[in-house]
From Swiss-Prot:
It comes from Ajellomyces capsulatus (strain NAm1 / WU24). This is Sensitive to high expression protein 9 homolog, mitochondrial. Keywords: Coiled coil, Membrane, Mitochondrion, Mitochondrion inner membrane, Transit peptide, Transmembrane, Transmembrane helix. Required for the maintenance of the structure of the mitochondrial inner membrane. Involved in mitochondrial morphology. Causes growth arrest when highly overexpressed. The lineage of its organism: Eukaryota, Fungi, Dikarya, Ascomycota, Pezizomycotina. GO terms for cellular component: mitochondrial inner membrane. InterPro entries: MDM33_fungi. Pfam families: She9_MDM33 (PF05546). Belongs to the SHE9 family. The keyword Transit peptide applies. Homooligomer.
């Protein structure tokens, strides 16, 4: 093998490394041109999204780390080749020196072939020494480049880790504020529902209930008035029937005693006639007793209707100070109310949720930064 083969191998390795580096640079330049020219709309939206979120720098660092890892692998391969070349140069020079020493030991018995061999070894010793020195220098350069590549790779990895930490903190902060915002919206909706929607719904239910009660009372009063009218008509029919029945015997008896008609006309009415007229004018006691409870029952119904409507009418729903004062007095008064277990549990859970939300908002606002 020629003496110049070892440094040529090392230099070819270095040239190959430089060529691969230039190839990577051309590849990245072409990739950037392609990304800038094609797919502008869709890729522009993704780039804007990643740029806003701070993830584009992380992607760039990731690509740099991949390229740096490839460079580290190449430098390690070159270091291995330089070590092999340096070992080969050392072995070749050592073998040449051993052969020279052997020839010098039998110098008195040299043949023409030994003389030519000694001459060639002596001439190549300088070249072998130069090749060994070049291989050593190439090994040092390769090791230094490998160390630089490894250090740059570590730096890139640390930079990527730092950027990812910053990005994750930013996303976590945004998610935290988003969570607090949603919680605040929920609390606001809860307060709006409790302050505005719930009273409106309650008033609507009370109004509907009052309308139904009033309709039922009016229907009942109408039925009672109809019954009273029927009973009054019955009483009037009974009152007209009694005089007709009393007058019928007199009409029948009148033709039998015609001679006494004048006498009866002239004779004043006696006690019997007064009793008869009294019986005709006075209605039946049973009918009077039947109508009296009906008439007395109508008056309590009217009174109960007025009292019920007075109780069911809602308080003034205006925004006047008197209305608010009355509402606060009702909230903190001694009035007894009846609640079901479900309503009590619902009120307790709503109060606990509202307290937790308020405490969370206060902690988020006043906690030390």
């Amino acid at each position: 093998m020629p003496a110049l083969s070892i440094p040529q191998t090392v230099f070819l390795c270095a040239e190959g490394r430089e060529g691969s580096r230039r190839g990577e640079e051309r590849f990245h330049a072409a990739k950037e041109r392609w990304e800038g020219q094609s797919g502008g709309a869709e890729r522009g939206g993704n780039a804007g999204y990643f740029h806003k979120k701070g993830f584009r720098d992380i992607e760039k660092l990731k690509q740099d780390i991949l390229a740096q890892e490839q460079r580290v692998r190449e430098t390690r391969t070159c270091v291995q080749e330089a070590k092999e070349a340096y070992s080969t140069a050392i072995n070749r020079r050592s073998a040449s020196q051993r052969e020279v020493n052997e020839l010098l030991q039998r110098k008195h018995a040299w043949s023409p072939t030994d003389l030519e061999r000694f001459t060639s070894l002596y001439r190549s010793d300088h070249a072998n020494e130069r090749a060994e020195t070049d291989a050593q220098e190439a090994l040092v350069v390769a090791e230094r480049e490998a160390e630089e590549a490894a250090a740059l790779l570590s730096k890139s990895i640390l930079s990527r880790y730092h950027e990812e930490q910053i990005w994750s903190d930013k996303i976590r902060r945004m998610s935290t504020w988003g969570t607090w915002g949603l919680m605040g919206v929920n609390v606001l909706l809860f307060l709006i529902f409790q302050v505005a929607v719930e009273p409106w719904r309650r008033r609507r239910l009370v109004k509907g209930f009052e309308e139904k009660v009033m309709e039922a009372l009016e229907r009942e009063n109408g039925m009672k008035e109809g019954v009273g009218a029927v009973e009054g008509a019955t009483l009037r029919d009974g009152a007209t029937t009694v005089p007709a029945a009393a007058a019928a015997p007199s009409l029948i008896a009148e033709p039998v005693t015609p001679t006494f008609s004048n006498i009866s006309d002239e004779t004043p009415a006696g006690p019997s006639d007064a009793a008869m007229f009294t019986e005709q004018d006075v209605p039946d006691p049973a009918v009077v007793s039947a109508t009296a409870p009906t008439l007395t029952a109508l008056q309590p119904n009217k009174q109960s209707q007025s009292s019920t409507s007075a109780l069911l009418l809602p308080p003034d729903a205006s925004l006047s100070p008197d209305s608010w004062r009355q509402t606060i007095h009702d909230l903190f008064g001694e009035r007894r109310i009846t609640l079901s277990q479900r309503e009590l549990t619902t009120v307790a859970l709503e109060s606990a949720a509202a307290g937790a939300a308020v405490m969370g908002v206060l902690i988020a606002l006043f906690r030390p930064r």
